[in-house]
Amino acid sequence: MPVSLVIDNRQKQVEIEQKLIMLLEKAVITSLAYEGWDPDYEVSLSFVSNKEIQNLNRTYRGKDYATDVLSFPLVDDTDGFPMGEEKLLGDVVISVEKAVEQAKEYQHSFEREMGFLMVHSLFHLMGYDHLEETEAQEMRKREEIVLTEMGLVRE
């Protein structure tokens, strides 16, 4: 069974088109394939406003500001297999408002920014982090490989 992307659009600032959903599904498939993971996972993806992601960031991370993406893994870090019987990889929450801001700031397309945020979040769901510089470099390298494979190169 292919990857399942469960979408919850809770923002009204930007219309989420089917083309974008397909791109984000491709991000999931490509990221999992790059890591050699089975593609049979379900990922929950919520599109939210800056206000909502700030509330989530405060609640779950103790940081009182709007961030671009939050990742909530449902995979057991010790063995890489999902906890429970269902193959739920985790939840991704993207501030679409922040993605628009960052696309302008970095002077690339909204689609490239959303693709990057999805890939970045997926690597978190698969157990990667960027707390240490070496971890950050490794994660960034993997993200760039996946984004390049998807055709989402820096403009």
UniProtKB/Swiss-Prot annotation:
Cofactor detail note: Binds 1 zinc ion.
Pfam families xrefs: YbeY
GO CC term, one of those recorded: cytoplasm
Cofactor: Zn(2+)
EC annotation from Swiss-Prot or TrEMBL: 3.1.-.-
HAMAP family linked: Endoribonucl_YbeY
Similarity comment text for this entry: Belongs to the endoribonuclease YbeY family.
NCBIfam families recorded: rRNA maturation RNase YbeY (TIGR00043)
Function recorded in the entry: Single strand-specific metallo-endoribonuclease involved in late-stage 70S ribosome quality control and in maturation of the 3' terminus of the 16S rRNA.
The name this protein goes by in its record: Endoribonuclease YbeY
Protein source organism: Alkaliphilus metalliredigens (strain QYMF)
Record gene name: ybeY
